Amino acid sequence: MREFAHQLRRGLPLNKQIDSHHWVDGLNELQIRERASLSDAELAGQLKEVGPKAVRGRWRTPPPMRYLPLPFGPPIGWQPLKYLLDVGFTRDVWCHRIDICRATGRPMDLTAGHDGRLVADIVAEWAAIHREPFDLVLDGPAGGTFRHGHDGEHVDIDAIEYIRTLTGRRPGRGVLSHPLPL
């Protein structure tokens, strides 16, 4: 929690410098700047050291703090801090895993039990936010078949490409034009 407070205090002012419209961009910019000189091994070492502490810190956040409202911007709107701690951080790290695998040319080891659960959760929130009917077939180990409403657009796409589309990493048309920032 101490690191998060540091990032808020130092990162939020960076939003003006980088012409950002979302508060989290300043935090990301601060993380990049503070770690730009580190080697890959040093970054990995920091992650090994801090990662478990950060997860424990999430779970130790006092209940009153977990309900403090935070602005996520459209389409998510205002959500309690617990949304960020329980949902947002997990999805963010998972989505960056997709980015890293693509950037390094490594295959992403996907399972229905882990990755499929994340994808299903994302589909459910996405459907609730935009409310447009759809019949969605997501291919691959993290995929599944999802239906929302009746007589909706039929979409067949790889599960990971679906996530990349919702997050703006690739263009979306039709029902896939509704974003869900992760």
Predicted ranges, named:
Residues 149-182:
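C-terminal interaction segments
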Residues 1-60, 64-69:
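Short, helix-capping/interhelical loops that line the mouth of catalytic, cofactor-
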Residues 42-46, 84-88, 154:
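Short, contiguous, pocket-lining structural segments
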Residues 115-154:
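An amphipathic alpha-helical core segment
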